[in-house]
Amino acid sequence: MGRVVAIDFGEKRIGLAASDVMKSIAFPFKTVEASFQLEKTLETVAAALKEKEPIDLIVVGLPLMLSGHDSPISIKAKAFGEALALKMQTPVVFWDERLTSKQVENNLREQKLNRKERAKASDVLAAQLILESYLNKL
């Protein structure tokens, strides 16, 4: 029985979260630095995710516009997710993550974290929220 992992895709950093093997709880896992080279970013993410194998499913967050249409970053997230599915030979689903980053930012501000601390934690916590949202729909 494998895990479900989630990805909060960004051009600078990528947040990763993983479920327990029962697929009921989402845990923040790791933040990795993105590269301008897709293949290098894929290698970095795939290497990080190998720590959580076996993986049954990868959930990639899509930061859609409020209208529901693709944003420039959601188009890149789709391309990344499709390439990662091929690389890891693991199914990928895309999950609407509108306002996830804003929710995380508000939560971190309430904790009185400075900007540097918020930036460090926001991507991995956004991945956790994406995964929680997905797991709650199962």
What residues fall within each predicted segment?
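Conserved catalytic-loop position in the HRD/HxD motif
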Residues: 8
